[in-house]
Structure formats: structure tokens, C-alpha cells
Regions:
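Conserved ABC transporter NBD signature motif
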Residues: 56-64
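Conserved ABC ATPase "signature" region
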Residues: 63-64, 111-130
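Helix-to-loop junction immediately C-terminal to a conserved catalytic motif
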Residues: 48
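Catalytic Walker B motif of ABC-type/P-loop ATPase nucleotide-binding domains
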Residues: 159-162
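A short, proline-enriched helix->beta-strand linker immediately N-terminal to the Walker B motif
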Residues: 153-157
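Helix N-cap at the start of a conserved alpha-helix in ABC-type nucleotide-binding domains
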Residues: 170-172
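Conserved ABC ATPase signature
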Residues: 134-138, 142
Length: 177
């Protein structure tokens, strides 16, 4: 379970998240719905540790993020997959390298095992035959699919999605859902 208690985050004195209290059950699909600019992405970035709240607490099970050691944060990060609004791919890396990237940091898999898993994930999102291409050689929709493949590469316990269907055709959106 992910528990958010009295979360506050502001920028330049302007509150974006104010007194947020919510619980997300493990194994359930939860959605954060709100108007553009309402703080959905800021909440997501706090949940995954890319931002630190000004006050309040986020807990994964009985572990409070604010009290986690670097080692515990790394272990938590292994359990998280992230699909960003954009593809968030590395321009200097090929498609397969982009998908393999988190595996290099968070697994002890051999290069062959990482490549095999990356290929499997690319096939799951219907990106076939593009593994040696660079992101700028792909359409926006294909880049998004590669980002999704990277997000599922570690078979995460928690999958956070920031507008996961943006940039995808209707068929692929249904497939991803």
C-alpha cells in the first residue's frame, strides 16, 4: 500500500499540493484525475521520489520515504516502473539500450539476459525491428511505446503512468490499457 499523509509541495511560495491525504492499495488500478495544471504530475513525481515534499509523508508499506536510506530507496526504485508524458528516452542510446538502461542499475542480470528481456518488452508493445534505431528515427507514438517497454522491463510492483495514452493511436491505447 502507498499512503500519502498531509502532503504539501509548493514552488516560489505558491502551493501546488496542499494537505493531500490518500491511500493506494497494492494490486489496484488508481487514477489521479484533474484539470491541466492541477498538480497531478507534481504528485506523481513526489510519489516516485523525483521530488521531495515540503512537508507530509509518503509511505510504501511500513517504510516512510523520508526515513529511507539510499540503499532502501534503491530497492524501492527497483519496484517502480514509470511511463512519462513524453517518451523520456535518451537520444544518445539505441532503442534496445534505452529499454536495457534500468536493468543495468537495478539487476545483476548478464548483458545477454538484459538484452533478451528488453527484446521481450519491445515485442509486448509491438516495437519489432527497431532495436538498433535511435529515438529521433522513430515516430512520437513509437517513442512512447519504447518508453512503455522500459517501464515494464523490471516487471515492477508499482507502475506509475503520467498520461500513458498520449501520443498513441486508438488501437495501441486499448492494447496498453
Amino acid at each position: 500500500m502507498i499512503k500519502v499523509e498531509n502532503l504539501y509541495k509548493g514552488f516560489d511560495g505558491v502551493p501546488v499540493l496542499k494537505n493531500i491525504n490518500v491511500e493506494y492499495e497494492t494490486g489496484k488500478c488508481n487514477m489521479i484525475i484533474g484539470a491541466s495544471g492541477s498538480g497531478k504530475t507534481v504528485l506523481l513525481k513526489n510519489l516516485i521520489g523525483l521530488m521531495t515534499p515540503d512537508s507530509g509523508e509518503i509511505s510504501y508499506g511500513d517504510m516512510k520515504m523520508s526515513q529511507m536510506t539510499d540503499k532502501e530507496k534503491k530497492l524501492l526504485r527497483q519496484k517502480i516502473g514509470i511511463i512519462f508524458k513524453g517518451s523520456a528516452l535518451f537520444d544518445f542510446a539505441t532503442v534496445i539500450e534505452n529499454v536495457m538502461f534500468p536493468m543495468e542499475f537495478f539487476t545483476d542480470w548478464s548483458p545477454a539476459q538484459r538484452r533478451e528481456r528488453a527484446q521481450f518488452c519491445l515485442e509486448k508493445v509491438n516495437v519489432i525491428g527497431s532495436d538498433k534505431k535511435f529515438p529521433n528515427e522513430l515516430s512520437g507514438g513509437m517513442q512512447k511505446r519504447v518508453g512503455i517497454a522500459r517501464a515494464i522491463a523490471l516487471n515492477p510492483e508499482y507502475l506509475f503512468c503520467d498520461e500513458p495514452n498520449s501520443g498513441l493511436d486508438p488501437y495501441t491505447s486499448i492494447l496498453i490499457d
